[in-house]
């Protein structure tokens, strides 16, 4: 098995009308928990790491873990650079073998965002690495970045069309009302805006901030063209809550093999649920077909 580009996964998803789940990883246990479910449900998967994750565990170690698990689980997978902001950082990681990167210039004005994304696309495409970018800006907290509601804004369909044409990006993360983190009230998803974007943009669309979004909303976004669904916060909360509960019930416990497995099992339930919502179960193709 090998680390593959997300473009092969997303092309299949777009053709068949499902979405590939992208789960954020943090250590060996989170990688293993996710892949155990993907093997069980025969689902394609994208393992996403933010810059903070690569500070916690070195790139070479994460890459080696993903490669080893891909082989032992017999699952081709994509290791994705999530919310990276530096061309130099992406260049280093792509040269080390990563084949999927998100360059996040959403905090820049349109023209500056285009310039940054185009520079990343030019480099990455020469190395069979797919590129995701974001237009519009989600609120909430992601890694060390925090965007308040006043600075969040939705994606304009005509700007999205122009953005894709100018950059040559492979997939586009759109802002349609979701936010990073958990919601204090039911999110208002602009499905009409998503439909209008889909009419003028033919590349795979990406839904960020899918944690805590009602399942029926996520399914509707997939019907309207979303091919990649990002999940992070719900995974962490499930893992942490289960471990906390275990220590309350076992105050003298100290064996990571027990409490980490409890956390992993809780995370697996979230993974299983998201794969079902994305309708990606049974969609895994043999490696040679990617």
UniProtKB/Swiss-Prot annotation:
One of its GO terms (cellular component) is cytosol. The keyword Endoplasmic reticulum does not apply. The active site is at 82 (proton donor). GO terms for molecular function: tagatose-bisphosphate aldolase activity; zinc ion binding. Its cofactor is Zn(2+). It catalyses: D-tagatofuranose 1,6-bisphosphate = D-glyceraldehyde 3-phosphate + dihydroxyacetone phosphate. InterPro entries: Aldolase_TIM (IPR013785), Class_II_FBP_aldolase (IPR050246), FBA_II (IPR000771), TagBP_ald_KbaY (IPR023788), TagBP_ald_KbaY/GatY (IPR011288). PROSITE patterns: ALDOLASE_CLASS_II_1, ALDOLASE_CLASS_II_2. Its EC number is 4.1.2.40. GO terms for biological process: carbohydrate metabolic process; D-tagatose 6-phosphate catabolic process. Binds 1 zinc ion per subunit. Dihydroxyacetone phosphate binds at residues 181, 209-211, 230-233. Keywords: Lyase, Metal-binding, Zinc. Zn(2+) binds at residues 83, 180, 208. Pathway: Carbohydrate metabolism; D-tagatose 6-phosphate degradation; D-glyceraldehyde 3-phosphate and glycerone phosphate from D-tagatose 6-phosphate: step 2/2. Transmembrane segments: none annotated. Gene3D superfamilies: Aldolase class I (3.20.20.70). Pfam families: F_bP_aldolase (PF01116). SUPFAM superfamilies: Aldolase. Signal peptide: none annotated. Catalytic subunit of the tagatose-1,6-bisphosphate aldolase KbaYZ, which catalyzes the reversible aldol condensation of dihydroxyacetone phosphate (DHAP or glycerone-phosphate) with glyceraldehyde 3-phosphate (G3P) to produce tagatose 1,6-bisphosphate (TBP). Requires KbaZ subunit for full activity and stability. Homotetramer. Forms a complex with KbaZ. Belongs to the class II fructose-bisphosphate aldolase family. TagBP aldolase KbaY subfamily. This is D-tagatose-1,6-bisphosphate aldolase subunit KbaY. It comes from Salmonella arizonae (strain ATCC BAA-731 / CDC346-86 / RSK2980). The lineage of its organism: Bacteria, Pseudomonadati, Pseudomonadota, Gammaproteobacteria, Enterobacterales.
């Amino acid at each position: 098995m090998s680390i593959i580009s997300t473009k092969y996964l997303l092309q299949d998803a777009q053709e068949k009308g499902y979405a590939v789940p992208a789960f954020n990883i943090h250590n060996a246990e989170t990688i293993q928990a996710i892949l155990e479910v993907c093997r069980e449900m025969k689902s394609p998967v994208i393992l996403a790491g933010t810059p903070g994750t690569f500070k916690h565990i070195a790139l070479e170690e994460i890459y080696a873990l993903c490669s080893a698990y891909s082989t032992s689980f017999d699952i081709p997978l994509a290791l994705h650079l999530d919310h990276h902001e530096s061309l130099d950082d992406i260049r280093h990681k792509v040269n080390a073998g990563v084949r999927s990167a998100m360059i996040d210039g959403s905090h820049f004005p349109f023209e500056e965002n285009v310039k940054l994304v185009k520079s990343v696309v030019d480099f990455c495409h020469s190395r069979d690495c797919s590129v995701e970018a974001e237009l519009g800006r989600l609120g909430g907290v992601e890694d060390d970045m925090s965007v308040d509601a006043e600075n969040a804004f939705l994606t304009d369909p005509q700007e999205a069309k122009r953005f894709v044409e100018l950059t040559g990006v492979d997939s586009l993360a759109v802002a349609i009302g979701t936010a990073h983190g958990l919601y204090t009230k039911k999110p208002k998803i602009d499905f009409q805006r998503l439909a209008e974007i889909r009419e003028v943009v033919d590349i795979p669309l990406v839904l960020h901030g899918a944690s805590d979004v009602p399942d029926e909303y996520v399914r509707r976004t997939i019907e309207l063209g979303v091919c990649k669904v990002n999940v992070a916060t719900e995974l962490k909360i499930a893992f942490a809550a289960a471990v906390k509960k275990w220590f309350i019930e076992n105050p003298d416990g100290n064996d990571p093999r027990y409490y980490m497995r409890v956390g992993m099992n809780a995370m697996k339930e979230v993974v299983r649920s998201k794969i079902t919502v994305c309708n990606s179960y049974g969609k895994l193709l043999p490696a040679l077909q990617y």
